[in-house]
Amino acid sequence: MELKSTLLDDKAIKRTLIRISHEIIERNKGIEDIVLIGIKRRGYPLAQRIAEHIEGIEGSKVDVGYVDITLYRDDLTIVEKDPTVKSIDIETTIKDKKVILVDDVLYTCRTVRAAIDAVMDLDRPEGIQLAVLIDRGHKELPIRADYVGKNIPTSKNEVIKVMLNEIDGEDSVKIYDSIN
C-alpha cells in the first residue's frame, strides 16, 4: 500500500472526539441512561476516550463496554460473507438505555449491523445510536452514523487506516492507495 496522506493527527483526533462527546450530550439532553459500546478493535478505545471526555464535561461517569465482531472488518480490504459476534461485554444492563455504538471506520455497514444484532440479542435498549471517527462511504446497508468525526469519500481502491495509541502506539488516520 502506498500512503496518500495523513487525514488526522493526534490533536485532530482529540478535537474530533471532544466534538462528538458534546454532540452526544446535546442530542441526548445530558448523559442519563447512556451506555457506550465500542466495536472492537479500535472502536473500544474510542468509546473509552469519549466516555472520559463526557465525564470531564458532565462530571458523571458513562458505562462503557465492547462487542467483538469477527470475520469481517470495515477497515480491511478482505471481506468475508457475514460477520459474526465473538463476544459482548458490558457490566451494566442496557435495558431501556440509550446505547451508542462506537467504531473507527464506517464502510459497508455490515460490522455495525452485526453489532446492532448483538445488542438486541443481549437486551432491549431504548434506542441505538452510532458514532464513528471516519465515514468513508460505500454503504451496502441503509445505516447511517448519528455522530461522524470526518466524512472521507474514498474509492474502493483506497484504504483508511486508523491508528490509536492504545493499540498502535500513535494516533493518526491515514489514507492509502491499495496496490493490487
UniProtKB/Swiss-Prot annotation:
Keywords: Glycosyltransferase, RNA-binding, Transcription, Transcription regulation, Transcription termination, Transferase. GO terms for molecular function: RNA binding; uracil phosphoribosyltransferase activity. Its EC number is 2.4.2.9. The keyword DNA repair does not apply. It comes from the Bacteria. It catalyses: UMP + diphosphate = 5-phospho-alpha-D-ribose 1-diphosphate + uracil. The keyword Glycosyltransferase applies. PANTHER family: BIFUNCTIONAL PROTEIN PYRR. Regulates transcriptional attenuation of the pyrimidine nucleotide (pyr) operon by binding in a uridine-dependent manner to specific sites on pyr mRNA. This disrupts an antiterminator hairpin in the RNA and favors formation of a downstream transcription terminator, leading to a reduced expression of downstream genes. Also displays a weak uracil phosphoribosyltransferase activity which is not physiologically significant. Belongs to the purine/pyrimidine phosphoribosyltransferase family. PyrR subfamily. NCBIfam families: PRK05205.1-4, PRK05205.1-5. This is Bifunctional protein PyrR. It comes from Clostridium botulinum (strain Eklund 17B / Type B). The gene is pyrR.
